[in-house]
Amino acid sequence: MKFAASLDKTAIVLTVLVTVVFAVVVGGQYALIADAGRATPVYTTVGCLAIYGLAFAFRPAGYVVTAEEVVVSRPLWNVHIRRADLRRVAKLPARDLSASIRLFGVGGLFGYYGRYANTTLGRTTWYATRRDTPVLLETTSGKKYILTPNDPGGFVGALAA
């Protein structure tokens, strides 16, 4: 069963702002620097495109629940979480994510994904596109994942079936 994952307003605004800033920086450098021998615009362009491309490639695009696993669909390298390894699945109140600190990952450009920590949940791995529909998946090995389908109740129900 497929579950959509759309961006919240904060992620949309941040994605648009980063896109505009990168376009202005890259376009502005090429417009202002007439010296073709300088490599600075090339380095900046490559850096901006790498950041943007990697953020897009690893963003969560949706979720699929099968009989064997939960799949986090991404443009590059899907994430597979075996259902047999799940100890706990719970719909969380959004406030449980409010004090989270990003340890390594992305905090708004195409979503929220990577390693996060907070006092309520401890260390977690997020594959989220919004912060108002969190679902916690905890494995028997103690790994904790935060997913944010548009329909968290249906998602939890599909995993309970």
Where are the regions a protein language model picked out?
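Hydrophobic alpha-helical transmembrane segments
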Residues: 35-46
